């Protein structure tokens, strides 16, 4: 087999492949074996008919078609391997020549990972917000904790924000009742915004057994997207009484004896949350800094595939009704043109980021260990409420293990980029990135070596104990 590569663009190639028929003999053998199982000839057991008789029965063309269909994927893969290409997506294959007993010639056009010139990672400078915990933030956490231990008490006044109400609802569209909108005794926290638009504004000030009608747009059901006249009746009003923030409350709500100790723990809690947010900011800014300093050619077909997927998901729930989709966007203060522009921008950035991270990973020779994969599987299992083995089976069935592997590798790559960069806050303080991004590659290697040494020493000690016994 002979193959050559034409560079059509920085992200696309055409592979020309020539396969002499002598190399297709194993493919012919397999094809005839398969066809022999499918075709029954008098006097021969299934699978035992001679090749000449089979060919005479089904025709040479059918045999050639089977051989070519079976041969193309493997010959394409072989050409990719020998050319040291890194394809993205599926190829577009065209048979340009097929001469029986002579040769098979085909071309395969495919997007590839482009060559990317990377900046020196040590030159990257990342600046993020400092971690500051204010009294107001701690007070908000304490207030939230008090609310969890609050009690509800009935009141006879009008509804206020923060109250808990029991309500009846009914709705009509153009005078027609909407059965699915009718409900009785529905519990609702006023101001939460969890129900239909306009409800909270309508019931503010109402007392028990008072009603009000307002207009809102339905978001689901037969009349989705249409204006409805909704009538709400307040059945009861309750306010939440909060416990006093004292030592007694601290003992009730936590493991601490005093309110001061509880507040200190809330300070630590807020600081941990802000540390996570800071780590996310570091990650995002590291990627942004790399993107700003690096030219990344974009494979258009890969970008378009991402765009198509986003559009499909957006209109799938609307039965792919473009008109309804346009109306939905208009209600959100947007348009199809704006949606398409935003979708393309996001898709281009996503593809650029993936290509860039893969290029950095190759340069740094990032390796994914079994422990890295196990940690990700355990984390995902907890998120989805599955056993790790169940999750592995699902990922295998959906062919998602390679994507998970690539995602883990990119995560390790981002960590390596962060370690190489200079990371400071806006006050000029250098930030220790160890907690959220792990040890640097060098430190990780040292830790791994130490673990191996410790394990070896432990095994040696066990062997010595066994010998003594």
UniProtKB/Swiss-Prot annotation:
It is an enzyme of class 5 (isomerase). Residues 444-469 have a biased composition (Acidic residues). Disulfide bonds: none annotated. Residues 438-469 are annotated as: Disordered. Consists of 3 domains; the N-terminus binds the ribosome, the middle domain has PPIase activity, while the C-terminus has intrinsic chaperone activity on its own. Belongs to the FKBP-type PPIase family. Tig subfamily. Keywords: Cell cycle, Cell division, Chaperone, Cytoplasm, Isomerase, Rotamase. Its EC number is 5.2.1.8. It comes from Mycolicibacterium smegmatis (strain ATCC 700084 / mc(2)155). GO terms for molecular function: peptidyl-prolyl cis-trans isomerase activity; protein folding chaperone; ribosome binding. It holds the Pfam family FKBP_C. Involved in protein export. Acts as a chaperone by maintaining the newly synthesized protein in an open conformation. Functions as a peptidyl-prolyl cis-trans isomerase. The keyword Transmembrane helix does not apply. It catalyses: [protein]-peptidylproline (omega=180) = [protein]-peptidylproline (omega=0). One of its GO terms (cellular component) is cytoplasm. InterPro entries: PPIase_dom_sf, PPIase_FKBP_dom, Trig_fac, Trigger_fac_C, Trigger_fac_C_sf, Trigger_fac_ribosome-bd_bac, Trigger_fac_ribosome-bd_sf, Trigger_fact/SurA_dom_sf. It is found in: Cytoplasm. This is Trigger factor. Its main location: cytoplasm.
């Amino acid at each position: 087999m002979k193959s050559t590569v034409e560079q059509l663009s920085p992200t696309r190639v055409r592979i020309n492949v020539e396969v002499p028929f002598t190399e297709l003999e194993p493919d012919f053998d397999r094809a005839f074996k398969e066809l022999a199982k499918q075709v029954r000839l008098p006097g021969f057991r299934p699978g035992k008919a001679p090749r000449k008789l089979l060919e005479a029965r089904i025709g040479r063309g059918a045999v050639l078609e089977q051989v070519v269909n079976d041969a193309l994927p493997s010959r394409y893969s072989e050409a990719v391997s020998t050319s040291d290409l890194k394809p993205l997506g599926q190829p577009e294959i065209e048979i340009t020549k097929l001469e029986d007993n002579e040769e098979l010639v085909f071309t395969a056009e495919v997007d590839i990972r482009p060559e990317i010139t990377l900046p020196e990672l040590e030159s990257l400078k990342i600046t993020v917000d400092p971690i500051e915990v204010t009294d107001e933030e701690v007070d908000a956490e304490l207030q939230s904790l008090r609310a969890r231990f609050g009690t509800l008490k009935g009141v006879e006044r009008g509804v206020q924000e923060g109250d808990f109400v029991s309500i009846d609802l009914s709705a009509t569209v153009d005078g027609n009742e909407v059965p699915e909108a009718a409900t009785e005794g529905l519990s609702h926290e006023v101001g939460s915004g969890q129900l239909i638009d306009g409800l909270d504004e309508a019931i503010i000030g109402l007392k028990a057994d008072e009603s009000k009608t307002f207009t809102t747009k339905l978001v689901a059901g037969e009349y989705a997207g249409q204006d409805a006249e909704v009538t709400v009746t307040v059945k009861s009003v309750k306010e939440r009484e909060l416990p006093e923030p004292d030592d007694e409350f601290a003992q009730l709500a936590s493991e601490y004896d005093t309110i001061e100790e509880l507040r200190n723990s809330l300070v630590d809690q807020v600081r941990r949350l802000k540390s996570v947010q800071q780590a996310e900011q570091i990650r995002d800014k590291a990627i942004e800094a790399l993107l700003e300093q690096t030219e990344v050619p974009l494979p258009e077909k890969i970008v378009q595939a991402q765009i198509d997927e986003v559009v499909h998901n957006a209109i799938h729930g609307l039965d792919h009704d473009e008109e309804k989709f346009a109306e939905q966007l208009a209600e959100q203060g947007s348009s199809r043109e704006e949606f398409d522009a935003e979708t393309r921008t996001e898709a281009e950035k996503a593809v650029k980021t993936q290509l860039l991270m893969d290029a950095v990973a190759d340069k740094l020779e990032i390796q994914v260990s079994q422990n890295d994969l196990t940690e990700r599987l355990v984390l995902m299992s907890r998120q989805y409420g599955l056993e790790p083995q169940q999750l592995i089976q699902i990922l295998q069935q959906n062919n998602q293990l390679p994507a998970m592997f690539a995602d883990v590798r990119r995560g390790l790559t981002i960590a390596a980029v962060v370690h190489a960069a200079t990371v400071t806050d806006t006050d000029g303080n250098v930030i220790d990135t160890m907690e959220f991004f792990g040890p640097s590659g060098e430190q990780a290697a040292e830790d791994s070596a130490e673990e191996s040494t410790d394990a070896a020493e432990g095994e040696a000690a066990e062997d010595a104990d066994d010998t003594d016994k």
